[in-house]
Design a protein with these regions (language model features):
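Alpha/beta catalytic barrel-like cores
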Residues: 1-95, 183-184, 194-367
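Eukaryote-skewed repeat-based solenoidal scaffolds used as protein-protein interaction platforms
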Residues: 74-237
Length: 367
């Protein structure tokens, strides 16, 4: 993977929200140690099995994932402190008292911190009610704000209208967030459509990265960046559909989706054809196979050095390139959207005009 930083350890600059599927976990397992300190993945665990626990225990040195078990039953076996692997708990405002206590134990058992995930479309109380909700979290988990990274999750953002709707909500939440001494604050969204099976085949299709555009409009406020990798933020999306070889390839402001049915024969032939088209495209990186583990695997298939693989492999290679691209972009010298560090206690200005205190307490929503 292309190094995304000059070498010294640093706070994470990127919080991808990833499903705990084989493809995404394999991509994390192939990260270079030089970039692990810059990445703080949030893993959404919907099925607890031995494979997931085994992979979590074998992640690269320095990579400490945050784990969200909202999709699992509230039961003793889903208590993160029992898993026996280093991790950071992800806390939701609606978590039960029992789960908050368990998350606090998990936080104290490893990194002494947690991620508080506020879902913009669901947790839409006023600022005072939101403060009461996070104070409940801190009390039951026995944590303080300085131990908590706030993740504002805008969910599905797939068009310009979604960006226009999400931005003012996020700005109000960021204004509220400055009341508290958070360890950090990040904004995440997902711009990938729920399904790509309806896209044209045998040609790369460009899809705008609306999640990235949304964050660029907020980066001046000092917030960190998060997304859903190359997956969708829509619950239940990305389910197995057609079996056509598919690669979702990230560039600065777009994805190029390759779905290949050409040649009509063996899957190895179709995928080799897809990979040859990709490595000859203008958006193929100058570093080529050295850009990421995923790019290396794509080059191998273009040269017919290995078989086509499976849908999990295609997701792994796509995710690997995506993580490398985002990290390289965030660390790029002179990048316009480079954020200043988050500071609490400072008013968040409305875009294009100075900030001023609002009146009316609960009459103005926090999200």
């Amino acid at each position: 993977m292309v190094p995304a930083h000059g070498g010294r350890a640093a706070e994470p600059v990127y919080r991808p929200i990833l499903a705990s599927r084989r493809g995404e976990l394999e991509a994390l397992g192939h990260l270079d140690d030089v970039v692990t300190s810059l990445l703080a993945p949030v893993l959404q665990v919907s099925i607890l099995d031995s494979y997931t626990l085994d992979v979590l225990g074998r992640l690269p040195t320095g990579l400490l994932p945050a784990v969200d078990v909202t999709g699992l039953p509230d039961a003793p076996e889903t208590e993160l402190a029992r898993w026996g692997v280093p991790l950071v708990p992800v806390i939701g405002l609606a978590d039960s008292d029992r789960r908050l206590v368990a998350h606090g134990a998990a936080a104290r058992g490893h990194a002494h911190r947690a991620v508080v995930r506020l879902r913009v479309g669901q947790d839409r109380a006023g600022p005072d009610a939101t403060t009461a909700a996070v104070e409940r979290v801190w009390r039951l988990a026995r944590l303080v704000p300085e131990q908590c990274d706030l993740l504002l999750d805008a969910g599905d953002v797939c068009c310009a209208a979604d960006v226009r709707l999400a931005e003012p909500r996020l700005r109000r939440l960021l204004e509220w967030a400055r009341r508290h001494a958070w360890r950090s604050v990040s904004v995440a969204a997902g711009g990938m459509p729920p399904a790509v099976s309806g896209l044209p085949t045998d040609e790369p299709v460009r899809l705008d990265r609306w999640d990235w555009r949304l964050w660029q409009r907020l980066a001046d406020l000092g917030v960190g960046y998060g997304d859903y990798g190359v997956g969708s933020a829509v619950p239940g999306a990305d389910q197995p559909g057609d079996r056509l070889p598919t690669v979702r390839y990230t560039t600065d402001d777009a994805w190029w989706v390759y779905r290949w049915s050409r040649r009509g024969g063996r899957g190895d032939d179709r995928f080799a054809d897809l990979c040859r088209a990709l490595v000859s495209a203008p958006h193929w990186p100058a570093a080529g196979a050295d850009f990421s583990w995923g790019d290396h695997e794509i080059v191998r298939r273009a040269r017919r050095g290995a078989g086509a693989g499976s849908a999990s492999n295609w997701a792994a290679w796509s995710t690997s390139h995506h993580l490398a691209h985002v990290l390289a972009t965030l660390a790029r010298p002179g990048r316009e959207a480079r954020p200043e560090p988050w500071r609490s206690g400072q008013p968040a200005a409305e875009r294009g005009r100075p900030a001023r205190p609002h009146r009316g307490g609960e009459t103005r929503r926090a999200g």
